[in-house]
Amino acid sequence: RREAVADLFGRATPAEQKWLQAVVTGNLRQGALDAVTQEAVAQVAEVPLAAVRRAAMLAGSTVAAAGAAFAGEEALAAIGLEVGRPVMPMLASSAPDVATAMAGLSPDGATEVAIDTKLDGIRIQVHREGDDVLVVTRSLDDITGRLPEVVEVARSLPAERFVLDGEALALTDDGRPMAFQDTASRTAQDESREGQRAITPHFFDLLHVDGRDLLDSPGHERLAALDALVPEQHRVRRLVTA
């Protein structure tokens, strides 16, 4: 295997070597290429693609999933959600219009559909283990130290261990979202917070709470658990069809 990798790098151009290095080290910041890599791993390791994608999501790394894939499907299945280890975010799919989206979610028209308000903020994932809190971005960058308000909210919630998914944004005095640039500036490296608006977290999903994984639970159970943990002012507004 080492010889094959060495041969691959030897035949690659400098630009291709840089890309390959990013794949190997887990620093590839391109979701589409990450998906292609997962497909290649599944094919070469002869394991289900769905198992590779789930393991990569839970491990927060395609590289970690690839290592497990070559050990077999059981090794992939052994990778689970861990509080304190960032999870690759699940991204929404697009639809041309509301009717098409509703038809896809509820073909018979009888299934309840939860519709969240779209917030133009920064995607955040919040992990809490006792007093320890971790806040990461959509790209899994650690921004805990830059968002003390989010840490404070997390510590105020009535649970010791949880993983929340949500959005963080700056609000005006009357509670309206400010421009995305105002929110984004708060996560910039070495950016001073002096004179800037406070950031408010709004959560729309709960992945784990006090030893209970909710990833595979029905949507209504996850939302009920979210509502029980997070007060209304820190939840994304939601409409559920009848």
What are these regions (language model features)?
Residues 1-200, 206-241:
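N-terminal nucleic-acid-engaging modules of covalent nucleotidyltransferase systems
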